[in-house]
Amino acid sequence: MDFGLQPPEITSGEMYLGPGAGPMLAAAVAWDGLAAELQSMAASYASIVEGMASESWLGPSSAGMAAAAAPYVTWMSGTSAQAKAAADQARAAVVAYETAFAAVVPPPQIAANRSQLISLVATNIFGQNTAAIAATEAEYGEMWAQDTMAMFGYASSSATASRLTPFTAPPQTTNPSGLAGQAAATGQATALASGTNAVTTALSSAAAQFPFDIIPTLLQGLATLSTQYTQLMGQLINAIFGPTGATTYQNVFVTAANVTKFSTWANDAMSAPNLGMTEFKVFWQPPPAPEIPKSSLGAGLGLRSGLSAGLAHAASAGLGQANLVGDLSVPPSWASATPAVRLVANTLPATSLAAAPATQIPANLLGQMALGSMTGGALGAAAPAIYTGSGARARANGGTPSAEPVKLEAVIAQLQKQPDAVRHWNVDKADLDGLLDRLSKQPGIHAVHVSNGDKPKVALPDTQLGSH
């Protein structure tokens, strides 16, 4: 628009008669509010999507949801920034308008100039107002130029302020083919409903054609057949067993059927004795068992009565049979040359150990747990044989036992007759096993003297005797 062709009265009049900067200020406030709302929605939307995708909802569906929602969050953030820019441009337009409004000549001033010109022209009879008229016209020209410059500046500023970035539509966050799929599913459901209705109609038609009135007739016929069968069987039994055969058969059958009902009154009759037996098992406490003498616990061990309280002789001799100690065969005639000589062999102490102290029988003797705890008890059991040797001495028990044990004094007497046949060895207890291993590979009769520390100490013949 060429503002130079428009007189200042019109230009200034339009600026003063227009709505002013109020609408632009309202637009700026509205754009600011829209920008803030979009920014808040974008932040809230992003927070909700992130919380669901990282905490409460995991998996491929969650990832797909987050991927679909991310473009919408980006769009809201971008649109919020554009709205903020529009608000700033609206405020810039307000500034441009106020600048142009202040720059244009006020309409009353232009009207006064025009009134003065008319008055000067009317009174210029002799040309005396020519200079005043020229000055008034010059002033008017300046007003024209001033309005023209103000409007050109305003047009340029308002054009820049009103140049906005075009807004874009929100992205599509759903599957475009979803509506088509929904329509197809709806069509299938409708077709299925139609098929179901058709099947229901067909079944109803078939049911209407079925002759349900024959069912009572069939039931009545079955009842008549059952009655006739019962009468026929009664007549047959009476014909075979006499006039009262059917009645007797019925009584026997009823009695047999009622046998199973006897358990009810039998249980009622036995409830009182059962109650007494239960109380007896719970509260009856038998007297404690008498203490078993320890001397009788050694019976059956095959030991002499004089050795029942101590260590029994582990070595014994057999008649007509050599004893085995490891790999050595010991002749039946052996003896101890002197009391200081100790014949070392595998020590097999078998002691009559003291019996376990008699325990009190539990109060509830008839309880299953009490009976189970007595299983495997040691009361009256024979003491187990204790094998203290190792190496060659532990193999002394592997020989064939003697057919009949003999007294140890007889064996010692036989050994005393051949004292030179015995080879004597002195050894400490620590080297005893090694010596016995070496002697097991040498033939002959060996007597090993075991010493305790610096002072040799030979055991008596009746404590631990053996051959090697």
UniProtKB/Swiss-Prot annotation:
Record-linked InterPro entries: PPE_C, PPE_dom, PPE_sf
Organism from which the protein derives: Mycobacterium tuberculosis (strain ATCC 25618 / H37Rv)
Similarity comment: Belongs to the mycobacterial PPE family.
Region span, Disordered: 447-468
TM spans (from-to): none
GO biological process, one term: magnesium ion transmembrane transport
Domain of life of the source: Bacteria
Name of protein: Uncharacterized PPE family protein PPE33
Record note on disruption phenotype: Cell envelope-associated glycolipid phthiocerol dimycocerosate (PDIM)-positive mutants with simultaneous deletion of PPE31/PPE32/PPE33 genes have a growth defect in Mg(2+) restricted media, particularly at mildly acidic pH, but the PDIM-negative mutants grow normally.
